Each structure stands twice: as structure tokens, then as C-alpha cells.
Amino acid sequence: MFRWFDVSYDVANTALIDDHRYIFVANHPFGALDGMMLADMLLRRWSDVGVIVNDLLMHIEPLRELWIPVNKYGRQHSAELYHQSMRSATKQLLTFPAGMCSRWVDGRVADLRWQTRFVKDAEYYNRLIVPIYVDGTLSSRFYNIYKVRRALGLSVNVELLLLVDELFRQRGTRVKIVVGRALDLRSMRGGVTECATLIRNEVYALRRFIPQQQAIHSAIADKIW
């Protein structure tokens, strides 16, 4: 699939112990592309991997075996599969707490508000959390449409209609991925919201390992209205 889209990725990572159970937590700059890349990265190390997604994505048949649906619409099967995966002794899990791809926020590309469920589940199911930073941007067109929509007070995410085209615009891209150290919630202070904020900060702190990262975002910033 990556060869067909002419995209690839490089990974800088810390040593992870294979027999731990992890929840990998990442930012979401591209949408589908980063999910596929991170799933591929994890499958190169572990044979049993699940990606936590909106249960509507279960209709994408080629990747269905990877998906772990969030019970967003009250579907009993989704809830059972989700908790079964969390309890699994072997399955490594990947989640994007923002639930949607990044937008232009405060002068740079960043996720919108993170959901905190991953913190509760990591604590309840005794999983370590591994922060991952994926470096990348969509086109300035995507972010400008988002800004215009917000300015007009429209609640419908019309910019999402561009995501397929944005995927093809990534042709020839080599994405940088940084995997951080595993975090144990037992060593973190604060409630669920505070822990989620700390972990989000850990994710974005990893971008310091990306050469010329600031230059990439500055080039996009020059085209934002």
C-alpha cells in the first residue's frame, strides 16, 4: 500500500520490552495515513496489534482485522470487542486521542482536544502508555477551509471531504516518527485530565528530535490566511 502511494517513514525509538502490554498514543496529523504507518510499524515487532478507531471504520474491509471499534453509538459488539482487546495478554494497542486529524491551532499544526478515555483504560487494564510523535502536515488549503468554517460558525467538518485528495498529495513523502519512553501512570500525579495533558505534552515534546521540524511548519504558516 505504501509503495502504491509512494510514501515511506523513518522511526527513531527507545528500547521497548516485548513482554509489556502497551497503549501507543499518537498525534494525528494526516488522518488515515499515520494510522496505517503506525500499524505497520507495530506489526513489524508484534504479531497481535489493534488500532482503536471510530466503529464506523469497521466497514473498511481490508483493514478490519486491525480495527478495535470504540463503542460510540451504543453497539454491544463494539463494546465487547474493545474491552476484550484491552484485557488481552498479547495485543498491543494504538490510539489517537484526538479522534480526528490535526488542525491549525495557535500558529501551528496540532491536535484538537484529546479524549481522556485512554488514561482510564490504561490504569484499569494495567497497561503502560507509549507516546508517539508523527511529523507532518496537510496542505494549507485544508487548514484554511477549517479556519473559514470556524469563522462562519459552521459545525459540519466540510474540510474532511478533502482527506482523500490530501492522501494523494502525500505522494513522495518520507514521514518522521519518534517513539518515546514508556510511561507508567502510577508514577504520574493528578487526575485523568491532568495525566492526559501531561501525555499530550510528552507527545509534542518528541518533535525536538525531528531535524528542521520548525522550518516545515513555517513553510505552511506562510500560506495560512
Locate the predicted segments by residue.
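A transmembrane-helix-recognition feature enriched in membrane-embedded lipid enzymes
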Residues: M1-F5
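C-terminal/domain-terminus segments
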Residues: R186-W225
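Soluble catalytic domains of membrane acyltransferases
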Residues: S8-D184
